[in-house]
Amino acid sequence: QLHFSGAMLSSVGLANEIAGFRSEVSTRDIIATYPYPNTLVVCEITGKQLKTVMERSAEYFAYDKDGNVCVSDSFLIPKVEHYNYDYYMGVDFKINPENPIGSRIEGLSKDGKPALDDDKFTICLNNYRYSGAGGYDVYTECPLVKEINVEMVELIMDYFHEYPYIEV
């Protein structure tokens, strides 16, 4: 997403079940891994708003009866919603599941500098999440910078054409 958008940050959620890629990737593999017809948007987000959406993702974690980190019931009941946990690129942070909900993101920084409430960033995410879906209402308050009206599957294929050998 960063490659195609030029944004400072990126946020992505993955499907509940992912087929994954083999050593040689086909178009079918890409479609199976990213089955949604989403496109990308870039919006402007403040440090405070960024922390708020990251706190929503941090709600994903809980502790089981033995004290082990697990997935929170709120992401499992009444239906499994792993796709509502978002991954973030372009910032450093720590999630501390021992803290109460709303106070779990620690050490949020960009390029080694603390992300302050009034700081402004550009973030790339899919159009579904930008609509506020999944409990991410804050995105609806973020000004749109640009839309990339190409479906994700096509962008992923373009990336593989440009970079045919990728190490993971």
Report the location of each language-model feature.
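Feature captures C-terminal
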Residues: 2-168
